[in-house]
Amino acid sequence: MKKIFLLFLSSLILVGCTSVTNTTNSSSESSSDSSSSTVSQSSALDFTVKDADGNDVNLADYQGKNVYINFWATWCGPCIREIPELEEVYQEYKDKDDFVFLSITSPNDAKFANANPADESQEVIISKAKELGISYPVLFDTKDQAATKFALSAVPTHIFINSDGMLKQTFAGQIQKDYLIQLLDEME
């Protein structure tokens, strides 16, 4: 009986970590239980994070561009596994004038009860990002403003905001390169 319960619990956790939410409801993978419903369609870019030098980065400055955001953590296995493919996609898209590719993490991971002390500082995160070969911008949600705005409950989470500043889609879980490219192309 204990084995059956553990198998059931493991299945629930696995399903919970791979949900897809489409705010336009045009995909068969849409969920009516949208975590992005807390985000006003007109204010998806209305928040500020920090860059590696501690400077404010206001995402509203990217209005008029398609914005992809990857929320991740150094202690997250799926986050680490998807980085090589994210890097490949970044290399393909980085020179497009109408496109912004960002990653956001939190140096304190206050949003997550299982926070790993390895992420206590930006320096640790920057060092790990370099070790993993990340060349795309790594930004810091030091006040959990972005995580709260998007009702983040898991990492990795992928956010797609169109050039009108409207949240188009969220995807929670490890994303495959082909699917990421498909979602990015649908924003154009």
Predicted segments with their positions:
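N-terminal "domain-start" segment that seeds a small globular fold
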Residues: 22-59
